[in-house]
Amino acid sequence: MRIAVVGGGINGLSCAWLLAQAGYKVDLYDRGKLASETSKASSKLLHGGIRYLEQYEFRLVREALKERDDWLRRVPSLTNPLRLVLPIYKNSKRSRWFIGIGLFLYDHLAGKSILPPSKWLSAKELLKIDSQLQSHDLIGGYEFSDGQMDDFKLAMWVAEQAIQIGVNVKENQPVDKVDVNGNLHVVGDIIHYDFIVNASGPWAVKLLEKSGITSPYRLDTVKGSHIVVSRKCEQSYLLEVPNESRIFFVLPWRENTLIGTTEVRQNLDDVVICSEEEKDYLLAAYNRYRKDSLKKEDIVDSYAGVRPLIYTAEDPNKATREYIIERDGKLLNIFGGKWTTALALARNVVNQLDRYCK
């Protein structure tokens, strides 16, 4: 059985790899280079997504926590465990008991994890860990576990596994359109497949529109921007954006500190960059928690990527991070998805194709 996978991000790569493992002959198409867009512009985290518990997305968080541990076990050379601190102040929007219940659920959903559970730290203990943390009105904080990765190198590792078992990778090969009968159109040619998997991420709906195919699902294309500053990160943090319900991360990254992310709706026809306003926003949020504040000159790098969120809310911060796999004839469309759950998503794709094709 011949399968075409459209999209060389982490979801497409994972689908191609596991489909080839299952015995399918797979061609993987990407309009540019593999993992060159959204998949290399993440927060570099392998995580369950503690904040998704606020949207009651227990299934997603459980799956992501299981997948987090699986990545850490499977590729230790490109991943590492991480202990993050979530400090709580008198004026924090989320109280100590609220965060405590959330982390209790997080630990419970993780099951028999390879990572240690969360624990409470007093203000005194936090300041002993990081003397530059803003101490005014500090109550204490929770320390909890997640994972970190080199997203681009890990995606390339998946690509290597796929290529080794026979996936035919076609880089710089844009797909013009597809149809529900298994026909894939590229410049100057129409190629027939037994099934096509549309794993083109933020461009999934756009490909359908170009193909004249309708779907009940919409994507909210949301830009997430990050800055890298020339400061060694001694402690990783999950922090509330001051005066907002949003959160952001402070993480170690190659002897520097990574700060992100933002959430700004993005037109796919526009250039995807971290704007000056976003840089100011992230610096201001970070500095509210520090005695040793940063200046714009401390920024040594910045990047941005577009996330394909299934449209479920006016506020993208409240949109689901779940994924949906939709079948339309000989076409499987993937909407949404997180980096951490890419292999779980791919297993679901394989299971669906096994039912339809075997």
State the predicted function of each range.
Residues 6, 192-201:
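Short hydrophobic core segments
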Residues 44-129, 248:
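Dinucleotide-binding Rossmann-like beta1-alpha1 core, especially the glycine-rich loop
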Residues 88-165, 170, 178-180, 254, ...:
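Flavin (FAD/FMN) cofactor-binding and adjacent substrate-gating region
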Residues 216-223, 232-233, 240-258, 265-358:
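C-terminal catalytic lobe of FAD-dependent flavoproteins
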